[in-house]
Curated annotation (Swiss-Prot):
InterPro entries reported in the protein's UniProt record: Conotoxin, Conotoxin_omega-typ_CS
UniProt keyword rRNA processing, yes or no: no
Entry-linked Pfam families: Conotoxin
Residues recorded with modification Cysteine amide: 70
Notes concerning its domains: The presence of a 'disulfide through disulfide knot' structurally defines this protein as a knottin. The cysteine framework is VI/VII (C-C-CC-C-C).
Residues cleaved off as propeptide: 23-45
SUPFAM superfamilies: omega toxin-like
Full protein name: Omega-conotoxin-like CnVIIE
Chief place where the protein resides: secreted
Length: 71
């Protein structure tokens, strides 16, 4: 019974901490697009600027494929 109460209190405390942290960090992230592009290039295999690309198989790190080349 004591263990159950301790687990319940711990879960409630962790949930409250996450909610407080999420509320405090709202609107503080700057340069969102830059971060998402960086995250995309680090998490997937993509082609650099000037490399051949296909609009069907979206695979450029820069996010744009023009005239068959990443740009």
């Amino acid at each position: 019974m004591k263990l159950t109460c301790v687990v319940i209190v711990a879960v409630l405390l962790l949930t409250a901490c996450q909610l407080i942290t999420a509320d405090d960090s709202r609107g503080t992230q700057k340069h969102r697009a830059l971060r998402s592009d960086t995250k995309l290039s680090m998490s997937t295999r993509c082609k650099g600027t000037g490399k051949p690309c296909s609009r069907i198989a979206y695979n450029c790190c820069t996010g744009s494929c023009r005239s068959g080349k990443c740009g």
